[in-house]
Amino acid sequence: EKGFGFITQDNGGADVFVHFRAIASEGFKTLAEGQKVSFEVEQGQK
């Protein structure tokens, strides 16, 4: 809904902020709560 959210890491690390522009997929970019994803953490401006 908001265009952003947080990913909870399996290893218990801090939640990771994710913006819809960072999702690598075709068409409507969305993630569902509880969906398993793979990701790489990058430092942003904030």
From Swiss-Prot:
Main location: cytoplasm
Induction: In response to low temperature.
Keyword annotations of the record: Activator, Cytoplasm, DNA-binding, Stress response, Transcription, Transcription regulation
Record GO terms (molecular function): DNA binding
Keyword Oxidoreductase among record annotations: no
Taxonomic superkingdom: Bacteria
Keyword DNA damage on entry: no
Cellular component terms per the entry's GO annotation: cytosol
Protein's recorded name: Major cold shock protein
Source organism: Photobacterium phosphoreum
Name of encoding gene: cspA
